[in-house]
């Protein structure tokens, strides 16, 4: 018997709409692989949600996710120290920032690495606050430190904004009064962070930066395209996007996607898909917030907060990039939704499985 979280009906509906969008794509052959993979990853959330049956399994999964995030971040730091890996000229405006090195780690793109770390860092923070002995506190502190350093090295402004918002939500849930210290924290960071990071952050919204103006032109072209295709979209994948978008592009800008998750969902499967996606997220957040309010166990409350803040921060960065373009990030997003659904009912799970 499958367990159904409140969001699951919308999850199934979203998968069905996305499959229909794939079938009716302007280029079915070009959309088929990406569309089917996306549907499979969406439904993986249901599988994961029903595979974890005890609190011990769930807690072990949480620990493994923090360790995996730390390993990925550590590899990214090594890339920076030893100059490993590929660097693309499209990742930064060389005229504004010079010859900067942005770490992609195993995600092949620093923005996608930032998306992943936004999900992982709140789990590490929850583990740090929930730890009951100094050994585990030091362990989680080191994990959080490694992931935060790697986040800085991505030089991803969207990811930084997403992480700041995730931190805001995290503190808002647990100790709202600490938000009064935010101005002092920001001033302190100004004196501690390297100039490269400060300059990069200060350039947010500067249309003189080619990557910013590039995104704005893509959004304008995408909105112009959606005036004609808002109902059913054009189908998922860059093949469908590149078949239609060039007719609407501004300044001849070439792009594989809309550089905005919400715009891209409408491109892939129409406005109904976006409405269902928003409803899915609404039920995800509502379920976790309700569980947080009635939960008495501090451990569960901490990780429920991490699940809310991680996805909230992820969605902030998703406004500046198409997060699901990288299939690993796509799979992780749906896995995190399943994780949130599990954490919402952690108190109802048995401590261990029944012995047979």
Predicted regions and their residues:
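Transmembrane signal-anchor hairpin modules in multi-pass inner-membrane enzymes, especially those
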Residues: 1-20, 26-33, 53-63, 128-138, ...
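Alpha-helical transmembrane segments of multi-pass inner-membrane proteins
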Residues: 13-23, 38-43, 59-99, 105-173, ...
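Membrane-interface helix caps and helix-loop-helix hairpins in membrane proteins
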Residues: 23-32, 152-153, 319-324
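Membrane-interface micro-motifs in multi-pass membrane enzymes
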Residues: 33-34, 105-117, 237, 266-270, ...
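Extracytoplasmic catalytic-loop and juxtamembrane helix elements of membrane-embedded
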Residues: 84-102, 199-217
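Transmembrane alpha-helices of multi-pass inner-membrane enzymes
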Residues: 179-184, 299, 303-356
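Long extracytoplasmic/lumenal interhelical loops at the membrane interface
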Residues: 198, 205-220, 224, 228, ...
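Hydrophobic alpha-helical transmembrane segments
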Residues: 270-282
């Amino acid at each position: 018997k499958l367990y159904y979280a409140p969001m699951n009906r919308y999850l199934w509906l979203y998968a069905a709409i996305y499959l229909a969008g794939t079938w009716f794509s302007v280029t079915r052959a070009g959309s088929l692989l990406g569309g089917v993979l996306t549907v499979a990853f969406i439904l993986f959330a249901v599988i994961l949600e029903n595979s974890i049956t005890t609190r011990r399994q769930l807690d072990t999964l949480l620990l493994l996710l923090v360790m995996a995030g730390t390993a990925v971040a550590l590899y990214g730091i090594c890339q920076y120290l030893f100059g490993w890996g590929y660097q693309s000229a499209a990742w930064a405006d060389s005229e504004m920032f010079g010859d900067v090195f942005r770490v992609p780690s195993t995600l092949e793109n620093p923005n996608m690495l930032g998306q992943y770390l936004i999900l992982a860092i709140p789990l590490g923070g929850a583990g740090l606050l929930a730890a009951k002995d100094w050994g585990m506190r030091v362990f989680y502190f080191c994990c959080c430190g490694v992931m935060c350093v790697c986040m800085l090295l991505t030089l991803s402004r969207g990811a930084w904004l997403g992480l700041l918002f995730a931190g805001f939500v995290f503190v808002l849930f647990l100790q709202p009064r600490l938000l009064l210290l935010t101005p002092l924290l920001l001033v302190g960071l100004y004196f501690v962070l390297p100039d490269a990071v400060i300059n990069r952050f200060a350039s947010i919204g500067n249309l003189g930066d080619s990557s910013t103006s590039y995104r704005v032109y893509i959004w304008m072209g995408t909105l112009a395209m959606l005036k004609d295709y808002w109902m059913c979209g054009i189908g998922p994948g860059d093949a469908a996007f590149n078949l239609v978008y060039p007719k609407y592009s501004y300044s001849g800008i070439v792009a594989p996607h809309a550089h905005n998750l919400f715009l891209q969902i409408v491109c892939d499967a129409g406005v109904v898909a976006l409405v269902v996606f928003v409803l899915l997220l609404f039920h995800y957040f509502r379920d976790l917030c309700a569980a947080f309010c009635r939960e008495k166990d501090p451990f569960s409350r901490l990780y429920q907060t991490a699940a809310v803040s991680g996805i909230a921060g992820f969605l902030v960065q998703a406004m500046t990039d198409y997060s699901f373009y990288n299939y690993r990030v796509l799979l992780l997003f749906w896995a995190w939704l399943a994780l949130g659904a599990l954490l919402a009912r952690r108190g109802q799970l048995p401590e261990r499985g029944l012995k047979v």
